[in-house]
Regions:
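Active-site acidic catalytic loop and adjacent metal/ATP-binding pocket
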Residues: 72, 174-191
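Catalytic activation segment of kinase domains across protein kinase-like and atypical kinase folds
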Residues: 183-210
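Short, glycine- and charge-enriched coil/turn segments that flank and shape catalytic ligand pockets
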Residues: 44, 151, 189-192
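Phosphate-binding core of ATP-grasp and ATP-grasp-like enzymes
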Residues: 106-121, 161-177, 199-204
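A long amphipathic alpha-helix within ATP-dependent nucleotide-binding catalytic cores
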Residues: 140-179
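Residues forming anionic-ligand binding surfaces in small-molecule and nucleic-acid pockets
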Residues: 1-4, 101-147
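Active-site loop/lid in soluble adenylation, ligation, and acyl-transfer enzymes
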Residues: 1-117
């Protein structure tokens, strides 16, 4: 996925993104809890607003986001390709020499990025920096839970890779390659990790024909 501004709205895009995300939330719910409450969005808005939310909205739990984009890559493309050309790795992860653009990686890798302000680009960071960011940002929220942000970052990495692997395997049976994707995670008051925002949509993933 990359940042591009289209000249006009995409008809029914909200419905598409919601349907795709809901599909993956349901299919991958055994891996990590997610934000969905199961509440019908039409039940929490005024009657004259129901048409606006129908098929394009969810009612989500209030969760505290981790301050990272949890990117998983299965192929060398995009900013990962640029990093590989310059350093021979991606986000500090060494990779085999001689890989071509769009080559499949030996195994999926977790390459976190910062959560940039609106209008700015996310910046790839090392896993160690991602852990430091999570430790600092979540310290007060995790006080008294026995958990810390660095460990939750590691938990998010493991969950993200497993989510990607299962999704990619299923997509392959439908003639689709998921080259890479971006997940976001949040925590509840007990410090339990949840998958939030969207999941494996065209806005957060690269889909290629197999």
């Amino acid at each position: 996925a990359f940042v591009v501004c289209l000249p006009g709205p995409v008809p029914r895009k909200g419905e598409l993104l919601t349907a795709v995300a809901d599909f993956w939330f349901a299919r991958l719910g055994h891996i990590v809890p997610n934000q969905l409450t199961g509440i019908d969005p039409e039940s929490v808005v005024a009657a004259d607003e129901r048409e606006q939310v129908r098929g394009r909205s969810v009612v989500a739990r209030r969760l505290l986001p981790l301050p990272i984009e949890a990117v998983v890559r299965g192929y060398v493309i995009g900013s990962g390709w640029k990093d590989y050309q310059a350093t021979g790795g991606i986000c500090g992860i060494p990779l085999p020499s001689g890989l071509k653009m769009a080559a499949r990686l030996p195994a999926p890798i977790f390459t976190p990025a910062t959560k940039a302000a609106v209008g700015d680009h996310d910046e790839n960071v090392s896993f160690e920096q991602a852990q430091a960011n999570c430790r600092a940002a979540l310290a007060s929220a995790l006080a008294g839970t026995g958990k810390n942000g660095a460990d939750l970052c590691a938990e998010a990495r493991a969950a993200a890779i497993r989510l990607y692997e299962e999704a990619a395997a299923y997509a392959a049976t439908r003639g689709i390659i998921i080259a890479d994707t971006k997940f976001e995670f949040g925590i509840d008051g007990a410090g339990t990790l949840h998958l939030i925002d969207e999941a494996l949509t065209p806005d957060s993933s690269r889909f290629w024909p197999a």
